[in-house]
Amino acid sequence: MVSLAVGTQTNGSVIRPASFCGVYGFKPTHGLISRTGILPQSPPLDTVGVFGRTVEDTALLADAMTAFDERDLHSRLRARPKLLETALSSPPLDPVFAFVKTPVWDLASDDCKAAFDELADVLGAGCDEVNLPGPFDGAHAVHRTIMLADLAKNFAGYYKRGADKLSGTMRGMIEEGQATLAVDYNVAVDWVELLNAGLDEVFARYDAILTPAAPGEAPAGLEATGDPSFCTLWTLCGTPAITLPLMEGSNGLPIGVQLVGCRGDDARLLRTARWLSAYVDRIAE
């Protein structure tokens, strides 16, 4: 319908829909693109992302949007990354991938699991299955604590003026957030650095993490937008991630591959994503 689009992700609202729609979706490092003007839900998590037809599309748009903004408290003052230029370059060596199933692997559909096992086999020596350390098992609960406490704060006016007009799901989320203690919130926020320290060990050996973007194909019906569980960990850690539309499920609908990079290394992730897309295309010929 359009060549480029912009979205936001607090849990999985860039990576997941890109997977369902068979397009590329790029969620940059938290703070890389300013969020000034968007409705805040959870500032430690909220991230502006982009959609495109190719890796190059997403790199082009993200490049144009990347800048320091003093109005955004999480905006990072640093050298502007050359996203498109790096994405278009060739890696000095073939990338090596860490296939991470994450603690929510059991939520993946059978065809999703089979497709990822096949991709790992195709990559051969360039892909190792890697298990994350024990603390990552609690990451989803940490994300929920942060997200709902912030939601309760930022949506307090809507709740006060018209709680009866909100959906039952939204009311429940706000009320759960209202019950969060400040000490629990602060502990949850501190977890982010602990988890990223664990990820740094992975990225010292691998160019990117390979993992599902969603549990499988898009769900039928309009009651829900799908399960974001495969995005939660990476949103919490603030790492860059990109969806590549490389697979199909049993119903012929897209299943996206999610690549995750080290915080701040967005350009390298985009270059790796472009390499993998081209590699899979060559194998499929």
Map each language-model feature to its residues:
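Small-aliphatic-rich amphipathic alpha-helix that forms the alpha element of a beta-alpha
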Residues: G198-D200, A224-P245
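Acyltransferase
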Residues: L83-T86, D110-L132, A156-R161, Y185, ...
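Short, surface-exposed loop/helix-turn segments at secondary-structure junctions
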Residues: S75, V142-H143, V187, A213-L233
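Short, high-confidence coil segments that cap the C-terminus of an alpha-helix
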Residues: V2, Y206-D207
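Short helix-loop capping/hinge segments that flank enzyme active sites or metal/cofactor-binding pockets
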Residues: P91-V100, V142-N196, D200, P245-G256
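A short, small-residue-rich loop immediately preceding and capping a beta-strand
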Residues: M1-T8
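Structural helix-boundary/capping segments
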Residues: T8-P103, D117-E118, V122, T180, ...
